[in-house]
């Protein structure tokens, strides 16, 4: 086969003359049950309506067929699949690093980015790293995490819930994870 040539995909549903059974359970255009009829009658009804006869459930006994516009059916199906994909969203964990000596301006900038992450629906991991003699002043780091928690979770317009708050320090850093609040 030549490169660049596509093989036409087989249709997921058989339509019109592709249906090779003697009788089918027929459903009308509006979804109303017509009953069990021969394939010739079903094809005639589809032709009278100016649409296709589509085999919906080939494994049923007798197979279920519906009188409908096949092109419109495929379009609506692809549209619903696109809508489902649009609604799916992978939640990421975004990390923001602080130090015990983070000044007010930097603190506000990092707080804004934390707010943005949470409003976008992502989780936020706050890591507070200690260097050198900062290890002797761990209470400053805990106070900073407490302040972040107050600003994002306990204010009147809180946007986050604490998922994990550190009870103690692991090595040279403390971590806290915040999850976005569910919107009502």
Curated annotation (Swiss-Prot):
Subcellular location: Cytoplasm
Coiled coil: none
Keyword Nucleotide-binding: no
Pfam family, one: IF3_C
GO biological process, one term: ribosome disassembly
Predominant localisation class: cytoplasm
GO MF annotation list: ribosome binding; translation initiation factor activity
GO CC annotation: cytosol; membrane
Keywords, alphabetical: Cytoplasm, Initiation factor, Protein biosynthesis
Function: IF-3 binds to the 30S ribosomal subunit and shifts the equilibrium between 70S ribosomes and their 50S and 30S subunits in favor of the free subunits, thus enhancing the availability of 30S subunits on which protein synthesis initiation begins.
Family label: Belongs to the IF-3 family.
Assembly notes: Monomer.
Name listed for the protein in its UniProt record: Translation initiation factor IF-3
Gene (name only): infC
């Amino acid at each position: 086969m030549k490169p660049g040539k596509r093989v036409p995909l087989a249709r997921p549903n058989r339509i019109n003359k592709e249906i090779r059974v003697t009788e089918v359970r027929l459903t009308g255009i509006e979804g109303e049950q017509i009953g069990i009829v021969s394939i010739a009658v079903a094809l005639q009804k589809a032709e009278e309506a100016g649409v296709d006869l589509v085999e919906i459930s080939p494994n049923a006994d007798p197979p279920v067929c519906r009188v409908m516009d096949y092109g419109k059916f495929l379009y609506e199906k692809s549209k619903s699949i696109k809508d489902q994909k649009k609604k799916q969203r992978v939640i990421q964990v975004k990390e923001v690093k602080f130090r015990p000596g983070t000044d007010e301006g930097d603190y506000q900038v990092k707080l804004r980015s934390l707010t943005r992450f949470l409003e976008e629906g992502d989780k936020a991991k706050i890591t507070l790293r200690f260097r050198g003699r900062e290890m002797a002043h761990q209470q400053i780091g805990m106070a900073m995490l407490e302040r972040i928690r107050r600003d994002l979770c306990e204010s009147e317009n809180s946007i986050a819930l604490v998922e994990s708050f550190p009870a103690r320090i692991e090595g040279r850093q403390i971590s806290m994870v915040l999850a976005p609040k569910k919107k009502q």
